């Protein structure tokens, strides 16, 4: 689904966000953000002091106290609005998904047969394990697995892809998603979820930012911010008795007021990152959805940013896929036509692009027409990840084709001999980056079919970028080591796993994790499920099986394996945004310190005027300028929090240096300029 990226300050979103920001003033909502809760309490306290001054019970400047109270409320509202804007974008996405979810009827079957007795029931009443018949024109009532039949399915409501897809029993394209529509033929489907647990329900829940759980890094950062807040709270609280004692000892000036202390506390605690932290997390999930990837939690997005090993399937990710048969290379004593005949027979029921291309090449080279497997009384042997070969049993002939090691075992188990000349042919094809497919009949090796693999344009440069970021790329392929090595060298990956089985892939993930690395991978088949469940970031293809989608912690609606690289970029961007704004927020304190400390204590200690390096007009304008800047900086940083900081492929050390210069130095200098400009404006308006 190509989700339209909404403008940050779109009028409809802003109106809703303003209303939500006011609703969030409820203390039951505010206490969830400890830093902003302190500002919230300070707002109430200064408001009560202002009302007390107006009633005549307390002396002080009503104008100054009222202005401080007003801008403290603005600080809380701006932080609420940042979160509300992020949630508003997610809610808009969730609303569009809800539009897909319609009340529909289902044809419930008593058993898994197309002609079984059926009962018309509401889709909402279906439970896990129920069997349904879905015919042309019907909406798929639940997420499930196809047990019988095959059909063309329109998944545009979920994926945004207008071209229909084929869903059929068996293989890796047997799962259907509730809310999609069958265009032709029929399917018998077993429901795999209960109501409220469908993929569409999970998508809606995932993009509902208000209901998301905090990620581990977010929790850790919140603890740090709370600790800083407590330190500054204790420091500020001790200033009042210190001020009273100083005035009595020096017989000069007057004690610092509660209003000034509240202003000082609010300016010193990390309100900028405290106000934007939740918005950054919600926006990260939203950006992931914008890339057509559904993450099960913010934890998954965050883990993507920490990944340092990518396991990438060769076919479809590194190469274009759809390998094409290019040449028949017969073994000694075998003619090319004999090899082509056997290869075509073994591929007649093979619906893979490779199998189709073998049939076509045999036609083109020797005018071998397709033959009907049923009329030949043939039994097709499907490919499996364990045997790594397929074939056909026909008229006493046992033909197999597959990877060289698989055919070698097959031939030797039938008391045959694997000719060294065929090993040479295999090596020759592999050295050129092709994939050798060995064909055998019984215990006799007939030769090799050469399959061509084309590496995607620009993929080498993308891997070079990942290397700069400290991410190791590992190509996963079922090819032999020579072929894998040739393609790995051409694509520029760091390592490869050849002749991969599900067990080998799982073992490799565990090996990297034992070294303290975080691993990301993609998968679409049931055989990928164990590895997907083990990986730290597991992106399942939407076109894949239900088992793969349940094992992963992300689902790519476009079913594009290359998307894994983009997922890592989005995760890193979210972590960088959080870190950059934290640096900026803490660096801000320095300028506010130079503004407020002289203003608060210079009357008692005139020597502190030396710290007034900005030459602010008066103590009241200095304090008010710092409070106003503290509020406005949240507004100016909302776009950055929602869009994310600009991301460039470079090492972690280089990124740290770059962000310290931009956000650390920027956080030091910008407040000096901003506070001075606000002070000049207040003075011009006679408000200082």
Swiss-Prot record:
Per its record, what are the GO molecular function terms? ATP binding; ATP hydrolysis activity; magnesium ion binding; P-type potassium transmembrane transporter activity
Q: Which Gene3D superfamilies match?
A: Calcium-transporting ATPase, cytoplasmic domain N (3.40.1110.10), Calcium-transporting ATPase, cytoplasmic transduction domain A (2.70.150.10), HAD superfamily/HAD-like (3.40.50.1000)
Entry binding sites for ATP = 350, 354, 383-390, 401
The membrane-topology field of this record reads:
Multi-pass membrane protein
Q: Where in the cell is it found?
A: Cell inner membrane
Give the transmembrane ranges.
34-54, 62-82, 219-239, 260-280, 594-614, 622-642, 662-682
Q: What InterPro entries has UniProt attached to this entry?
A: ATPase_P-typ_cyto_dom_N, ATPase_P-typ_P_site, ATPase_P-typ_TM_dom_sf, ATPase_P-typ_transduc_dom_A_sf, HAD-like_sf, HAD_sf, P-type_ATPase_bsu_IA, P_typ_ATPase
The EC number(s) this enzyme carries: 7.2.2.6
Q: Name one GO cellular component term.
A: potassium:proton antiporter complex
| Reaction(s) the record says it catalyses | K(+)(out) + ATP + H2O = K(+)(in) + ADP + phosphate + H(+)
Active site per database record: 313
What are the GO BP annotations of this UniProt entry? potassium ion transmembrane transport
Q: Report residues binding Mg(2+).
A: 524, 528
- Supply the alphabetized keyword list: ATP-binding, Cell inner membrane, Cell membrane, Ion transport, Magnesium, Membrane, Metal-binding, Nucleotide-binding, Phosphoprotein, Potassium, Potassium transport, Translocase, Transmembrane, Transmembrane helix, Transport
Q: What is its main location?
A: membrane
The family assignment reads: Belongs to the cation transport ATPase (P-type) (TC 3.A.3) family. Type IA subfamily.
Report the PANTHER family cross-referenced here: POTASSIUM-TRANSPORTING ATPASE ATP-BINDING SUBUNIT
User: What does it do?
Assistant: Part of the high-affinity ATP-driven potassium transport (or Kdp) system, which catalyzes the hydrolysis of ATP coupled with the electrogenic transport of potassium into the cytoplasm. This subunit is responsible for energy coupling to the transport system and for the release of the potassium ions to the cytoplasm.
**Subunit structure comment from the entry:** The system is composed of three essential subunits: KdpA, KdpB and KdpC.
Name this polypeptide is given: Potassium-transporting ATPase ATP-binding subunit
Organism of origin: Yersinia pestis
Name of the gene encoding the protein in the UniProt record: kdpB
